[in-house]
């Protein structure tokens, strides 16, 4: 429990659920009337969209040129295989005191039928571990062969959304005129940075016909709920009951710390800009 005067962030309950997913319930406060709603909406969005994690960016399956292809002697379609691959969960295999900032590598799988293919059959780099080995990938009949390779990346919000942005416009910095008014630059189209994630994906799609593209943003937090409760009816103070479900690659306590840090950094930057402009 972290407590500063009348502020608190307490983990009330935590448990492991089915298929390795993690659940935790927190009490966060104290807020004045109306502040809890603002805080709850902000931290929920940060938890769902700004968490670091592994993701498969694209997959190559031998014999498949598109998502709707059917492989011989394989019960699942290519689309079903891709959806099953997305259920696999990866974590870095490093000491706890060591930071894991970036990673880009690949994994592969090659199995012959008959039999079932699971996530445990995937071959990975030494620094990556699959924590969902029981996830079903495909069912092979006699004579079937499943061979695939995928690109694996570790990404976080700071890498995906750098402050300079994916689109860069030279006119934005000059939008403020000498008299302090802001010019309307909506008719000027920004230029696309060649090193941006979106630009790289467009280039990859043009250069490869057998690449099957998957996610571009990691989502280790699967679900977030919050309820606002009254703490003291006399002074109108409130607190939040926050529930978090993750896929097992990230502890709910860690996700709360990440979200609070990201929100603090974001608002702090705008506070500095406001000071400089005055």
Swiss-Prot record:
Pfam families: RNA_pol_A_bac, RNA_pol_L. Disulfide bonds: none annotated. GO terms for biological process: DNA-templated transcription. GO terms for molecular function: DNA-directed RNA polymerase activity; protein dimerization activity. It is found in: Plastid, Chloroplast. InterPro entries: DNA-dir_RNA_pol_insert, DNA-dir_RNA_pol_RpoA/D/Rpb3, RBP11-like, RNApol_insert_sf. It catalyses: RNA(n) + a ribonucleoside 5'-triphosphate = RNA(n+1) + diphosphate. GO terms for cellular component: chloroplast; DNA-directed RNA polymerase complex; mitochondrion. Keywords: Chloroplast, DNA-directed RNA polymerase, Nucleotidyltransferase, Plastid, Transcription, Transferase. Its EC number is 2.7.7.6. CDD domains: RNAP_alpha_NTD (cd06928). Belongs to the RNA polymerase alpha chain family. DNA-dependent RNA polymerase catalyzes the transcription of DNA into RNA using the four ribonucleoside triphosphates as substrates. In plastids the minimal PEP RNA polymerase catalytic core is composed of four subunits: alpha, beta, beta', and beta''. When a (nuclear-encoded) sigma factor is associated with the core the holoenzyme is formed, which can initiate transcription. This is DNA-directed RNA polymerase subunit alpha. It comes from Chlorella vulgaris. The lineage of its organism: Eukaryota, Viridiplantae, Chlorophyta, core chlorophytes, Trebouxiophyceae.
